[in-house]
Amino acid sequence: APAKRWFGHEECTYWLGPCEVDDTCCSASCESKFCGLW
């Protein structure tokens, strides 16, 4: 199931997985190149 996190004023929904194959990843977690890792 997708995880929900808040980034600024946006509620982001993304799957835990590599950002390059997951375009629903929040931009904040994509900085670490792996969704869900902040």
Swiss-Prot record:
<feature type="disulfide bond">
    <location>
        <begin position="25"/>
        <end position="35"/>
    </location>
</feature>
<keyword id="KW-0960">Knottin</keyword>
<feature type="modified residue" description="4-carboxyglutamate">
    <location>
        <position position="20"/>
    </location>
</feature>
<keyword id="KW-0528">Neurotoxin</keyword>
<feature type="modified residue" description="6'-bromotryptophan">
    <location>
        <position position="38"/>
    </location>
</feature>
<comment type="similarity">
    <text>Belongs to the conotoxin O2 superfamily.</text>
</comment>
<feature type="modified residue" description="4-carboxyglutamate">
    <location>
        <position position="10"/>
    </location>
</feature>
<protein>
    <recommendedName>
        <fullName>Conotoxin r7a</fullName>
    </recommendedName>
</protein>
<dbReference type="GO" id="GO:0005576">
    <property type="term" value="C:extracellular region"/>
</dbReference>
<feature type="modified residue" description="4-carboxyglutamate">
    <location>
        <position position="11"/>
    </location>
</feature>
<feature type="modified residue" description="4-carboxyglutamate">
    <location>
        <position position="31"/>
    </location>
</feature>
<feature type="disulfide bond">
    <location>
        <begin position="12"/>
        <end position="26"/>
    </location>
</feature>
<keyword id="KW-1015">Disulfide bond</keyword>
<dbReference type="GO" id="GO:0090729">
    <property type="term" value="F:toxin activity"/>
</dbReference>
<feature type="modified residue" description="6'-bromotryptophan">
    <location>
        <position position="6"/>
    </location>
</feature>
<feature type="disulfide bond">
    <location>
        <begin position="19"/>
        <end position="30"/>
    </location>
</feature>
<feature type="modified residue" description="6'-bromotryptophan">
    <location>
        <position position="15"/>
    </location>
</feature>
<feature type="propeptide">
    <location>
        <begin position="1"/>
        <end position="5"/>
    </location>
</feature>
<keyword id="KW-0165">Cleavage on pair of basic residues</keyword>
<keyword id="KW-0102">Bromination</keyword>
<keyword id="KW-0964">Secreted</keyword>
<keyword id="KW-0800">Toxin</keyword>
<comment type="function">
    <text>Induces a sleep-like state in mice.</text>
</comment>
<keyword id="KW-0301">Gamma-carboxyglutamic acid</keyword>
